[in-house]
């Protein structure tokens, strides 16, 4: 388990819970606007943190923390993810998994073992634009399968799309929302310009507040829960 960083306290990562956050190292996507390049680009990797250090910390925080969010990078790339989550669950913590949905077989295994209590999946955009947005070829069937697994798992979940122009347009978001069941929560994430994976991207921006508000109203005609973050 390659852990590139962690946050001992968070009020925002697991909805309505006090938690810690674990950042795994490594990702199979290369989204140019990624804000965690040190977890994606091997040339920027730092020293890893022993999983045992995290487990020891969590053991001492029982009764004070409720949950642990596993994010990245892409956590499902970690071969021993299930073993780590088992140890976290044995300590009595809820587990939230952030994923890009590219590994449905891993998701199915984690769900079958009851190792995840909440899943947040990033849907980058329409399937036909995935390669351009993710910076690599992506199997669209894997994305669709992951959406189906997550939405049918019977646990709290959300799907998220980052609103970053020119990689994605408002019409692209509407198309993307069509991949999501009406009863699932869909989160429109504002893009915040900061450190990026790629350089020389030119002008990239979040949608304006007016565009986001209009988009939310439009999506709410088809989805039961649309949030802006």
Please describe what each predicted stretch is.
Residues 55-67, 76-209:
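Conserved AdoMet/S-adenosylmethionine-binding subsite of the radical SAM
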Residues 1-18:
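Short, charged low-complexity linear segments at domain edges
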Residues 37-68:
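Conserved alpha-helical substructure of the radical SAM core
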Residues 23, 71-72:
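A secondary-structure boundary/capping signal
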Residues 6, 189-191, 228-229:
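Conserved beta-strand termini and adjacent loop/short-helix elements that scaffold enzyme active sites
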Residues 2-7, 26, 52-53:
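SEC14/CRAL-TRIO lipid-binding/transfer domains and related phosphoinositide-recognition modules
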Residues 16-49:
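Canonical Radical SAM [4Fe-4S] cluster-binding loop centered on the CxxxCxxC motif
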Residues 209-229:
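Charged phosphate-binding loop/patch that engages nucleotide di/tri-phosphates or the phosphate backbone
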